[in-house]
Amino acid sequence: MTVGIVGLGLIGGSFAKAYHEAGHRVLAFDTDQSVFDFAVLSGAVDGLLSEESLSSCDLILIAIYPSAAVDYLRQHGAHIGPKPVVIDCCGTKRLVCDACFPLAKEYGFTYLGGHPMAGTHNSGFKYATPTMFHNAPMVLVPADHNDIDLLSRVKELLAPAGFGRFSITTAEQHDEMIAFTSQLAHVVSNAYIKSPTAGLHKGFSAGSYKDMTRVAWLAPEMWAELFLENKDFLMAELDTLMANLRQYQDAMVHNDLPGLVRLLDEGRKRKEEVDGR
């Protein structure tokens, strides 16, 4: 198999290393020539993904920011042809899918939205690993949910990455869920660490602090773009969170022990309902 990868950051680099280890040919493109050169020297990338080589790929993975992914397919879509399956790996889906489904139809290539649910707080090719996606979920957003043959083909093409499960959904549902499961967590973590007390935490912190602050270490430009593209769903989640926090605050202001116990018990029960013990 020949795999084309656009963007050699953490996600694109991990795909490159995974497919290379599985014995496949990897062509890649990155706007940073030094990153591309390093990927070639490391052996993960076999050559340049050019306009001339796009049509020879079996799979093309677009692992760059959402707006850049759309721009790339607008500029190069005419050179892809019918052979490759194109999957973007962006963290939001509505903007990309709304633009790229029509582009795929116009230029005659096969496209699906995708979101590999894996990563670390580090970014860049040097942190990429061939096992990044092992047993991780992969979300797919096809134009036609009933195209079983295509979905089977996609799962086969993605097999070398080692995903544990695939979820098929719409761009709308993906973005609504991601606002809660990922984006809200990043906002809360990033805001939490801004407390003046944070600088004094050593010797007083353990697992709770580490859990709350892990994703505060993020790529600001990427996450800002993702937040703004999904601001309707994310702002709704923020409204819910702030309303809930005000209830805890009000209970403390009024020394309402029974009320505070009730709120905490509601949260404990909700966690059990959602995830079990």
Please identify what each model-predicted range represents.
Residues 60-61, 87:
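N-terminal Rossmann-like NAD(P) cofactor-binding module of classical short-chain dehydrogenase/reductase
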Residues 74-126:
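Rossmann-like NAD(P)(H) cofactor-binding subdomain of soluble oxidoreductases
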